[in-house]
């Protein structure tokens, strides 16, 4: 299977739960899976060490505020590489509707739904819209 993973959290959220989870997910898959092919999206200039031959890094030029990358670039790259599954580990934030392959997210918590007063209005809107 050809699997794309949004690995931007490894760089952008390093030291947080989502950043640590994303890094450990990629590292663990690298250690145990020699059969599937992986395309890991990372911010331009970032890298992951000691990846096996079935892992490729796709550098992306985007920042936290841009959604052009999510809406246009990701779907095109996934199509160009015939990806069968795309995983977004950060609560599905940034998951474009324009993606043609199967999609998966990791939902870390539902605090914005259960206790909306504990999160910013901006995050609450993003969470509810996604």
Enumerate the language-model features and the residues they cover:
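Carbohydrate transferase catalytic cores enriched for Leloir-type hexosyltransferases
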Residues: 1-130
């Amino acid at each position: 299977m050809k699997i794309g993973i949004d690995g931007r959290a490894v760089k952008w959220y390093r030291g947080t739960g989502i950043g640590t989870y994303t890094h450990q997910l990629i590292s663990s898959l690298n250690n145990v899976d020699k059969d599937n092919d992986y395309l890991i999206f990372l911010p331009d200039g970032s890298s992951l060490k000691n990846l096996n031959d079935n892992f490729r890094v796709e550098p992306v030029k985007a920042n936290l505020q841009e959604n052009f990358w999510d809406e246009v670039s990701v779907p095109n790259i996934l199509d160009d590489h015939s990806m069968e599954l795309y995983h977004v580990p950060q609560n599905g934030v940034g998951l474009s509707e324009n993606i043609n392959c199967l999609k998966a997210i990791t939902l870390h918590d539902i605090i914005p739904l259960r206790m909306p007063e504990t999160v910013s209005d901006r995050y609450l809107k993003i969470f509810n819209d996604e």
